[in-house]
Regions:
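Mature catalytic domains of secreted/periplasmic carbohydrate-active enzymes
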Residues: 1-261
Length: 261
């Protein structure tokens, strides 16, 4: 009541029978109070503690392998070995976290990222560096993340993501053929999870084929641009895919903004 939390996060054990009556009371009170506050809120849970559809299912340190028709969440930490500040933490590279974020959002999920402060409340230089790098990327590519929704398919490419929790320590060796898709209005965002040195990209989900051949998209591609640069890429489209050539490069994922019609 004092702080009006936007998220009420539960960890494990609450799926036990002894906790069930209290979960219902907590949810009813929280949701009713949120309605009085006129705020959108969420309850995060694990292990089927809540009935499906009444709260947000959470996967700890892991992801979904495929797109889901319902909203879900991943919770993980900047460090692989700890949730709190620890000397000599094994910090995850910002690029790896960004790839996970993009993959999660493309599958109808959200990322809850933990940062462990020191005892005096300050954030370590290592944490700050990772957060700053993520923020810099979001400044350029946030349009493909915020206020978007899933497309017809979450993406394409050879690299598979392990389904389930406690797998974020498994290195995902994404390639320049791995794309994740998000959408908004008449725009498709195709995010390449790794930059190709030659600047050439081929999005096979946008190939031109007959409806009998399992085509993902039958409409028109009006334009293609790259977030972060004013230089227009060269692009063509045929029965093998949408082919893009750009001089823009980065050490993190890049986003193609594709206008559809």
């Amino acid at each position: 009541d004092r702080y009006h939390p936007q998220i009420l996060y539960f960890d494990w054990w609450i799926q036990q029978e002894a906790a069930k009556p209290y979960l219902k009371k907590a949810a009813a009170y929280y949701y009713n109070r949120a309605a009085e506050w006129n705020e959108e809120v969420a309850i995060d849970y694990k292990f089927d503690a809540y009935m499906f559809g009444t709260a947000v299912p959470d996967i700890e340190r892991g992801q979904m392998a495929d797109i889901k028709p319902y909203f879900w969440q991943t919770d993980t930490a900047i460090a692989l070995n700890s949730w709190c500040y620890t000397e000599n933490n094994d910090f995850r590279p910002a690029g790896d976290i960004i790839c996970d974020l993009v993959d999660i959002v493309s599958k109808n999920g959200a990322l809850l990222l933990n940062v462990g402060p020191k005892a005096d409340g300050t954030i370590s230089d290592e944490d700050t560096a990772v957060l700053t790098a993520i923020g810099d990327w979001m400044q350029v590519n946030g349009e493909a993340i915020y206020d978007t929704h899933v497309w017809r398919t979450f993406g394409e490419g050879p690299t598979k993501v392990q389904d389930g929790g406690f797998s974020d320590g498994v290195k995902k060796n994404f390639t320049g053929e791995d794309f994740r898709f998000t959408a908004k209005d008449d725009t498709l965002f195709a995010i390449a999870l790794k930059v190709n040195d030659n600047g050439e990209y081929h999005i096979r989900s946008l190939r031109m084929q007959e409806h009998t051949a399992g085509t993902v998209y039958h409409g028109l591609v009006e334009s293609v641009s790259v977030l972060g640069t004013d230089d227009a890429p060269v692009w063509t489209r045929d029965e093998n895919g949408l082919h893009i050539k750009t001089n823009y490069t980065s050490d993190k994922p890049i986003t193609f903004k594709i206008k559809l019609n």
